[in-house]
């Protein structure tokens, strides 16, 4: 989630890369991406081919954290992804947050910037085309193992004239495309809590985290849903922003 130059990266000459190794379903299931937040990791894990939705207060920060962690080697709870794809449907890419997490993990800011590919979409049509047509090509071309989609439904929430029938049809198409993509790579998206159309998609995510501010300042509650099971944990904002020392 760094720099506007990343948006133009897709227009540069194709990078010569080796073909990805064929991964079996068992291999994909064994690989796990950790949030590096023990209270969350103890209840939910993200496989190399998986789908998760984050909503509520601090959702973008959590996606930024996962974006950087996806680049880490597997022995550190990452996916060792050559590149991470950020399909920004809300214009919420967090440059400062990305740099901050890269610094905490001792990673080169330049290396992180070069390995995070950002493409923005602003209209419903652009979002659908990006997710259903462009993302599968980018995933294949750059050996992407992690796709981050901030603000999945923002374009719908900001369109005042789109008919509900058309909204449901487009959301169904986008959800179907995301499900197909998550059979190949990890896809993590965010949906605005209380958004006009959030109820149309939240039920489609078997893995989901909803973040709520507590009355006590500097704390929040995480409602975690994992394939039919659920758990509520209390967290501090510091646990979201600062990685634990090992």
Q: At which residue positions do the language-model features occur?
A:
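Conserved catalytic network of the ASCE P-loop NTPase/AAA+ motor domain
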Residues: 45-46, 74-79, 108-111, 138-141, ...
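Conserved inter-motif catalytic segment of the P-loop NTP-binding fold
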Residues: 82-160
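Phosphate-binding/switch region of NTP-binding enzymes
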Residues: 176-246
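The Walker A/P-loop phosphate-binding site
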Residues: 2-103
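Short, hydrophobic/amphipathic alpha-helical packing segments
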Residues: 63-68, 128-132, 171-175
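P-loop NTPase motor core
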Residues: 136-204
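Short, well-ordered alpha-helix to beta-strand connector turns
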Residues: 49-50, 81, 113, 182, ...
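Hydrophobic/aromatic beta-strand patches that form the interior of the parallel beta-sheet core
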Residues: 52, 85-87, 117-119, 186, ...
């Amino acid at each position: 989630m760094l720099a506007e130059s990343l948006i133009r990266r897709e227009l540069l000459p194709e990078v010569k890369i080796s073909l990805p190794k064929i991964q079996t379903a068992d291999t994909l299931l064994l690989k796990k991406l950790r949030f590096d937040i023990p209270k969350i990791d103890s209840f939910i894990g993200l496989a190399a081919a998986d789908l998760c939705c984050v909503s509520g207060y601090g959702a973008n920060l959590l996606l930024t954290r996962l974006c950087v962690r996806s680049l880490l080697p597997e022995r550190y709870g990452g996916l060792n992804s050559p590149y991470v794809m950020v399909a920004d449907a809300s214009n919420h890419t967090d440059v400062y947050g990305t740099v901050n997490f890269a610094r905490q993990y001792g990673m080169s800011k330049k290396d992180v910037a070069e390995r995070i590919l950002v493409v923005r979409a602003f209209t419903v049509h652009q979002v659908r085309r990006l997710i259903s047509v462009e993302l599968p090509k980018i995933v294949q071309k750059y050996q992407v193992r992690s796709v981050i989609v901030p603000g999945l439904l923002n374009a719908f929430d900001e369109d005042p004239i789109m008919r509900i029938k058309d909204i449901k049809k487009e959301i169904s198409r986008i959800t179907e495309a995301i499900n197909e993509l998550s059979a190949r790579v990890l896809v993590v998206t965010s949906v605005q809590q209380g958004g006009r159309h959030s109820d149309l998609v939240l039920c489609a995510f078997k893995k989901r985290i909803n973040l709520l501010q507590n009355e006590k300042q500097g704390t929040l509650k995480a409602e975690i849903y994992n394939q039919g099971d659920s758990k509520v944990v209390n967290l501090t904002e510091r646990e979201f922003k600062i990685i634990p020392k090992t």
